[in-house]
C-alpha cells in the first residue's frame, strides 16, 4: 500500500505554486495525497513568515499534528517555506516534533530528506541561495487543482530590501528563471489543457534584469503570448519601481494579457514611503496608475496596504486614504504593521499602539467597502468574458479578465471554455450572469 502525505499551505501564490511542485515530486516517489492529516505518513507545512500571525498558526498546527506520532510513530512531520528559511534550527528547538525542514531553494532534495528522517536523523536542510542544480526544481511534474489555469514561477527572491520585509532573507536575491525553461513549461501546460498562464514572482516585473544580457519583462509577455493555446496571461506581483512604460505598452498591445494588475503601494505618505525604502513617491505611483488606466481599457487594480507603520501620523494615514479614493482599487489587501525579527522597521522608534492601528484599519476598510459598492454597480448590465473553471451546486464558475469571480447557469461541457455572460447581479467580489455565447 502506498504511503500518504498531507500538505497545508500558508501565504502567497508563490507558496501555493511551490506546494504544487512538492505534490508532484511526492507522487513520483509513490506517495498519495490525503485531505485527512490523521491518516498521513508525511505531514508538510509550507509556511509564510511575512507577518507574526502565520508564525503562530504554524506553531499551533504543529502542536496538533504531533498527536499523529502516538498513532503512527513512523509518521514524519516536515516544515517548508519561508518560516523554515528564517528560523531553521531555532524552530526545531521550539517544536522538536519536526523531522524534516527545507526551504524553497531545495525542494528537489525532499526524497533524500525523507530517507534521512526515516533512518532516525533530523533532516534539516536550509540553503541561503538557490543551488547550482536549481533547474532540477523545474523538471518535476506539477500537481495542480485547477485544470485550466496554472501558475508559472519566473523569478525567485527580491532585491528591494524594504525595511519591513523578510522576503530578501527568506527568498534570497532576485534570480530569474531562464527564458527557455519558462516557455517549455508553458508549452507543456497548454498541451495539458491549460488556457490561462499566471506568471509569478516576488517581484515579477524585475524578471530578466539579472541576466548577463538582460531581457525586459515585456519581451517575456510577448514570447508567452505567441505560444499557441495561451488564451490568457496574468502576472503577480509587480513592484512600482519596475513597472516600466514598455510593460504598460505590452499590456495594452497583447490581447491575452488580462486587464487586471496587482501593484502594492503600501502607504500614501512620502515620508513613510521613504522610511519603508520603497523607492517611489505617492505622486510617482499615481502617475503610473494614470498611464495604466489610459492605456489598458477598464483595468482593475488591486493592491497591498500597511497600516500603522512606525511613526505614522494621522496626516500620513490620510494620504493612504487619498490613494484609495483616487485609484479606486477593486481589491485591497490591508494589514496592520507587524514587526518582523531582523528587519530595520522592527527596531524603529515610534511604534504605533495596536488600538491606533485597529482604528485606522477600521476606517480604511469602511472607505474601501463604500468604493467597492460603487464599483459593483458599474458591472451590472455589462458583458464580461469568463473562463469557466469549475461547476458547483449546479452553476458554472469562472473569472472575468478583471479577476472577478462570476457564476451562471450552463452545461458542464463548457468547463475550460471562454464564454460571454451578461451580468444581472453584482456584489463587491463576485458577479452573477446569464450565458450569451461561447467564444472559444
UniProtKB/Swiss-Prot annotation:
Residues 3-119 form the MTTase N-terminal domain. Residues 144-374 form the Radical SAM core domain. GO terms for cellular component: cytosol. Residues 377-437 form the TRAM domain. [4Fe-4S] cluster 2 binds at residues 158, 162, 165. InterPro entries: Elp3/MiaA/NifB-like_rSAM, Methylthiotransferase, Methylthiotransferase_CS, Methylthiotransferase_N, Methylthiotransferase_N_sf, MiaB_methiolase, rSAM, rSAM_horseshoe. It catalyses: N(6)-dimethylallyladenosine(37) in tRNA + (sulfur carrier)-SH + AH2 + 2 S-adenosyl-L-methionine = 2-methylsulfanyl-N(6)-dimethylallyladenosine(37) in tRNA + (sulfur carrier)-H + 5'-deoxyadenosine + L-methionine + A + S-adenosyl-L-homocysteine + 2 H(+). [4Fe-4S] cluster 1 binds at residues 12, 48, 82. Its cofactor is [4Fe-4S] cluster. SUPFAM superfamilies: Radical SAM enzymes. Keywords: 4Fe-4S, Cytoplasm, Iron, Iron-sulfur, Metal-binding, S-adenosyl-L-methionine, Transferase, tRNA processing. One of its GO terms (biological process) is tRNA methylthiolation. One of its GO terms (molecular function) is N6-isopentenyladenosine methylthiotransferase activity. It is an enzyme of class 2 (transferase). It is found in: Cytoplasm. Its EC number is 2.8.4.3. The keyword Transferase applies. Catalyzes the methylthiolation of N6-(dimethylallyl)adenosine (i(6)A), leading to the formation of 2-methylthio-N6-(dimethylallyl)adenosine (ms(2)i(6)A) at position 37 in tRNAs that read codons beginning with uridine. Belongs to the methylthiotransferase family. MiaB subfamily. Monomer. This is tRNA-2-methylthio-N(6)-dimethylallyladenosine synthase.
